[in-house]
Structures are given as C-alpha cells and as structure tokens.
From Swiss-Prot:
The gene is htpG. GO terms for cellular component: cytoplasm. InterPro entries: HATPase_C_sf (IPR036890), Heat_shock_protein_90_CS (IPR019805), HSP90_C (IPR037196), Hsp90_fam (IPR001404), Hsp90_N (IPR020575), Ribosomal_Su5_D2-typ_SF (IPR020568). Signal peptide: none annotated. Homodimer. This is Chaperone protein HtpG. It is found in: Cytoplasm. Residues 342-547 are annotated as: B. It comes from Helicobacter pylori (strain HPAG1).
Amino acid sequence: MSNQEYTFQTEINQLLDLMIHSLYSNKEIFLRELISNASDALDKLNYLMLTDEKLKGLNITPSIHLSFDSQKKTLTIKDNGIGMDKNDLIEHLGTIAKSGTKSFLSALSGDKKKDSALIGQFGVGFYSAFMVASKIVVQTKKVTNHQAYAWVSDGKGKFEISECVKEEQGTEITLFLKEEDSHFASRWEIDGIVKKYSEHIPFPIFLTYTDTKFEGEGDHKKEVKEEKCDQINQASALWKMNKSELKDKDYKDFYQSFAHDNSEPLSYIHNKVEGSLEYTTLFYIPSKAPFDMFRVDYKSGVKLYVKRVFITDDDKELLPSYLRFVKGVIDSEDLPLNVSREILQQNKILANIRSASVKKILSEIERLSKDEKNYHKFYEPFGKVLKEGLYGDFENKEKLLELLRFYSKDKEKLISLKEYRENLKENQKSIYYLLGENLDLLKASPLLEKYAQKGYDVLLLSDEIDAFVMPGVNEYDKTPFRDASHSESLKELGLEEINDEVKDQFKDLMKAFEENLKDEIKGVELSSHLTSAVALIGDEQNAMMANFMRQMGQSVPESKKTLELNPNHAILQKLLKCEDKEQLSAFIWLLYDGAKLLEKGALKDAKSFNERLNSVLLKAL
C-alpha cells in the first residue's frame, strides 16, 4: 500500500495552530499526555486478555519504554498495549469524533497558562506533542491485526498513513523535536518530568539512555559508553498503598496525572474496606467543574479495577449521575476479572460498593460545608448538579438537603435549610420557595410582598434543575415545602378573599382588560395578595410545566396566562373613572407590559410599548 494523504478536520487544524503558536506556557505536559495514552492502551489490552477468548493465551509484560537521541533531536514513547489499525488512526488522530476538540476550543479563555491546563481534560493530549515537535511519526499494530501502520504529520493540515513492518502489538511514537525544544531529548529532563507527573502510572516506565564513564588514569584514561535501561517510576497503584506511607503531595500529584488537571483537588477520600467485602476507593473532589458536566455524553471520572486490573472507565453506574464531577478509582477484590458491563449493572457487590462510596463522598462534602466561607469553592461549580440527587437518590435525600444552599428574599448570601428553619416566624407553617428564570426577576416579584408583610422569608430558586426536583421534595425537618406562587401557600398567609361588592365594582373594568388583551391572556382576576404592584401575570400550572420543559432542554411555547389585578391600587381606582376608551386602552396595555417586564425582564414588542408610553406622557404634560 502506498502512502495515502488525508486532511485534518477543520477543528483539528484550529487546535494544531493553537498548540504550535499559543499554548506553550507548560510544554512539558506533552510527555505526561503521551504516557497517559500509553497507560490507557495497556489497560485496554489487559481487559481484552481477560474477556476475549482469542487473546487469553497472549503472554506479555505490559510496559512503557522511553528513549531519545540528543544528536538527532528525537524522543520516542513506546508501549505494548492494544495498538491501532488504520481506521483507529484516522478516527483518533485525524478527526474530531473522539477528541472533544470542539468543546476544548469553545472553552479557551485566552489565558495561555489556563488554556494549556485544559489539554488533557478535553482528551486532546496527543496533539500537545506538536508544541515541541516539528514532525511526529506513529507506528502501531493492533493486537487483533497482522498488518501494522505508520501515521506521519508535521501538523500543517495533513497527515499520511501507510503500511509498515512492526512485529509486536502496541504503539511507538517518535517526536522530531524543534530546535528550541531539543532539551527534552535528555535523560534528566525526561526523568524529572516522569517523576513529576507519572510516578504512579500503574505500569513500569523504562528509560533507555547511554551512560558515560571514564576508566583508567592519566594517559590511559578512556571514555566508556554503556547503554542502560532503568525503570524511572514506582509503577505502584497509589490507591493500594497504605495511607500512612503517603503524603498530601503524593495524593495531589497522582490526581493531576490521573485527572489530567493541573489544578489541585479540593479534597480526596482514600478508603480501604476489609471484611465480607474487600475493596479500596480513592475519590477526588476537583476544584473546577469538568467541561462536559452538563452534557448528556459526559465521561465518567471513575475507573473500575478488579485486583488492580483495569476493567472500565466508561461505566456511568459506578456513581450516581449527580456525583459525576467526582474523579477516582474503585478497586474490588471480589468482582470476577472477566466481568461484563451487563453484569456490572446488576452486580450486588458493585451496588454495595456504590452505596457505601456515595455515603463517604457526601460525608466529605458535609465536612467541607462546616466552613461556610470556603464551602462556596465547592458549591459554586457543583451545587447545581448536586441538586439532581433530590430527584433519584431517596436514600440520601435528607443528607443532600443539608448540603444544598439557596438564595432567599431576606439574605444577600446563600443559606442552608437549617438556617432558614431556625429563622421561621412564630406562625409560619412552611418553607416557601419561588421558581423563576433568574435571581433579579425573582427578587422583584410582586408575589413576595405579602410574605414580606408577614416577615416570612422565601427561597429564590433560579436554577433550571429546581423546577424539576422541588415538586418531589415534601419536607425538611418536619416542615413542609410550599411553592410561594401556589394558591395553597397564599391561603396560609390568611388573606381575605375578594368580596362580591368589589368584584361587581370592577366588573366593567375587568371586561375592558379582557377585550383589549384577548389575544394575550386567558383571563383577568382580582387578587388579594398584591400590595404595591398593580398587576401580576400568574398561572401556577403553566409555570410548572414551562420550568419543567426548560430543564428537559425543550423550547417553551407561548401560552396565554391569567392577569391578576390589585383592586386596592390607586391606579386601578382611578381607571374605574376613566371614560376615554382610547386612553383607557393605552393604560391597560401599559399595565400589561409592566407585568410582563416583571415576569420576563423583557418585552416581545418594545416598539409598541414605547409608542404607548409616549402617547400617555404627551397627554399628561
């Protein structure tokens, strides 16, 4: 087969241009990324050797080998893992399908240090090698194939693939280093980077180098060169080590390598269980949210091992989805080595490990919450996703409620339900909350006025997830939750109903509202729960459905709602006496527009609103 030339996808070209010209603040991470990829390839081969009958007789010692040539300015990374075939090369090294490149590009901030830290997190680590290499040659042979392939590119828009000769399965990557980056072809440079980032990769990393020493003395002294191959990492599964042997730095270094994250984690939980079940877990709570946390196709941050043998890193059942920001390892002594994904989903051992792990993680979050000043470092990135647990994790619902924080009518900061509960007024029967699209609109809601008169605080919930989960939350500490917009809640305020005399007094004016706004609203009602506001747009059933649809990612169709009027307001009292139909119509529309502004913060037809306002002002002056 002759060389076949391919063109990188557009996004890959953009990425390569960034790698080569912009993201150079921490170039050494390229080696961390290539070693991590090699480790993944070894993990995958180990798993296949357990599950694929054709490969069970394969006898290999998994390892990663590094070598360099300082004269030729080359650096080579070699593994004997699963390898790639031609299609894998095109898919993984030429297209966006597996790389997360589009998400990476959209997440760039312009800060070179921060942006370079994103490289591994977004699965685009291979391309980081172009920060230091003018050309890359990949030779690879898939374990299930007889034919090996070579991939060659200078990172300038194209790559070539051809057949090649390679006896052993696995992948060998050779970097032709740029002049200014030739220092990476050095024993001590490579050794230092591996010890910094890859000390606890669970496979041995060997470095081949030429050792120079002198023998003899005086005129008989001569230089002797000897090729050596040393293991330069511990190759120890850090999670299997005793906690007493490990320092805080060990945990943090492992996290940065494992999670491809240059920042330090907020916290970690290392736990070893012995007894009827034996397993070890090491979980990390990151300091920033994974880029794909709110995507349906988010990648699990937890790897499952059985007796140190990698099983999967793509099982979203290892932890509940509301803890998908957690990174870490579960290593079981009791699961069968050839466990399939289908068996995993029904396995009682794993279910027990999962249940205990969730409790451990929530307990750690509870520990973080004891320091409210620092708790925001956790809650700001992860509070929204934590709320999802209220919908499905009934076993831990009470614990989750303790961990959640909310804005409220009376407080300028996030508060806990415990704090709200401690400040209940003497006759207050419920915990009140109000759902809306954003915090500013909620704070301005006329619905809050009567609660304020009673001295009742109201939780203001503007996250989309709130509308999805709150209807399923019945109580906290024996105090029921109530939506502040619902009629049931308003009854608890002890409001008097509008009497027939007032209804009769406003009958003609309400008819005028209905005639003018017949295409906009489904009806007009007099309300006893408004104080300073003239009008309010309300419809509790439609509001619940709209919030639910937003949470499900669906567009919310326009629907007619009820316009509630405050019969005690001076403006409405004056409108009762307005006999100019044209002017009355203008007033009605202005009041409706005002109510829409309070509801949405914007108007669909701002031009007409402005014309009506000008007309009324002109007549008033």
